């Protein structure tokens, strides 16, 4: 079973194009994939294609990864967050979005099986739809943040950027030596995945990206505010936003634009 997962991952990865690549083979095709649930191997995901989809226009590809105890519907419907982490509305038809389902309501990524799932979804989607292969992104909260971090480690050459919301090293970090644009967003009073751990994740990619060592600022306790730190001298951008709060899927409250705005802006500038 383990050998099969690894072999499948190697075969799929060999077909993926790096962030320096061109447009996907789905460009110019009449698509067969439609909005809704799709199955791949023994897993599933929800796909959202823009209403004004143009098969000749390359789109961003954005993965929204759910938290522990959630599922793909939690991301799509916006349970405790804006739907699609607020990125669908900000994309204004420029992105195709994917919400995969984790195993057992999480992303343990045993033997890399969840990274292999993402690889397989990318291939299936890009074979059918028009994607700018230099414009793949991932974001998620808590365990979804941990899975986004795992993708930054294992697939830095395939993804342009990740946004890790209150994440930790809970889905592994195979590889983890290559540069990738990295945004971390973390509550200073997080009781589940501590704030200092979130800073450590960002510092790892600051080192990979050749950034200067930087002090990460924090807002005052009870200020209901945030402080953004942008690392300097980086080959790929690294930023970290500390906010006054705990382990929150929607930093500073549901409907607050902090995380969606920062994530979208970071992705588009990466």
Curated annotation (Swiss-Prot):
<keyword id="KW-0858">Xylan degradation</keyword>
<dbReference type="InterPro" id="IPR003140">
    <property type="entry name" value="PLipase/COase/thioEstase"/>
</dbReference>
<keyword id="KW-0964">Secreted</keyword>
<dbReference type="GO" id="GO:0045493">
    <property type="term" value="P:xylan catabolic process"/>
</dbReference>
<protein>
    <recommendedName>
        <fullName>Probable feruloyl esterase C</fullName>
        <ecNumber>3.1.1.73</ecNumber>
    </recommendedName>
</protein>
<comment type="similarity">
    <text>Belongs to the faeC family.</text>
</comment>
<dbReference type="InterPro" id="IPR029058">
    <property type="entry name" value="AB_hydrolase_fold"/>
</dbReference>
<keyword id="KW-0378">Hydrolase</keyword>
<keyword id="KW-0119">Carbohydrate metabolism</keyword>
<dbReference type="GO" id="GO:0030600">
    <property type="term" value="F:feruloyl esterase activity"/>
</dbReference>
<feature type="glycosylation site" description="N-linked (GlcNAc...) asparagine">
    <location>
        <position position="23"/>
    </location>
</feature>
<dbReference type="InterPro" id="IPR043595">
    <property type="entry name" value="FaeB/C/D"/>
</dbReference>
<dbReference type="Pfam" id="PF02230">
    <property type="entry name" value="Abhydrolase_2"/>
</dbReference>
<keyword id="KW-0732">Signal</keyword>
<dbReference type="GO" id="GO:0005576">
    <property type="term" value="C:extracellular region"/>
</dbReference>
<feature type="signal peptide">
    <location>
        <begin position="1"/>
        <end position="21"/>
    </location>
</feature>
<comment type="function">
    <text>Involved in degradation of plant cell walls. Hydrolyzes the feruloyl-arabinose ester bond in arabinoxylans, and the feruloyl-galactose ester bond in pectin. Active against paranitrophenyl-acetate, methyl ferulate and wheat arabinoxylan.</text>
</comment>
<keyword id="KW-0325">Glycoprotein</keyword>
<keyword id="KW-0624">Polysaccharide degradation</keyword>
């Amino acid at each position: 079973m383990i050998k099969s997962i690894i072999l499948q991952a190697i075969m799929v990865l060999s077909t993926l194009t790096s962030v320096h690549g061109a447009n996907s083979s789905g460009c110019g095709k009449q698509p067969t994939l439609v909005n809704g649930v799709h199955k791949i191997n023994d897993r599933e995901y929800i796909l959202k294609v823009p209403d004004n989809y143009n098969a000749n226009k390359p789109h961003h590809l954005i993965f929204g990864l759910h938290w522990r105890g959630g599922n793909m519907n939690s991301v799509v419907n916006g349970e405790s967050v804006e739907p699609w982490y607020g990125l669908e509305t900000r994309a204004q038809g420029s992105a195709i979005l994917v919400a995969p389902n984790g195993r057992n309501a999480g992303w343990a990524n045993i033997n890399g099986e969840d990274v292999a799932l993402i690889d397989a979804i990318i291939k299936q989607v890009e074979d059918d739809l028009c994607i700018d292969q230099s414009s793949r992104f991932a974001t998620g909260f808590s365990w979804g943040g941990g899975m986004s971090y795992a993708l930054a480690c294992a697939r830095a050459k395939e993804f342009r950027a990740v946004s890790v919301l209150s994440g930790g090293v809970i889905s592994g970090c195979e590889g983890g030596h290559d540069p990738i644009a990295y945004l971390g967003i973390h509550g200073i009073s997080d009781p589940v995945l501590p704030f200092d751990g979130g800073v450590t994740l960002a510092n790892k990619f600051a080192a990979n990206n050749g950034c200067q060592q930087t002090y990460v600022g924090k807002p005052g306790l009870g200020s209901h505010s945030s402080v953004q730190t942008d690392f300097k001298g980086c080959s790929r951008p690294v930023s970290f936003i500390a906010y006054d709060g705990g382990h929150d899927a929607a930093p500073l409250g549901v409907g607050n634009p902090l995380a969606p705005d920062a994530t979208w802006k970071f992705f588009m500038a990466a």
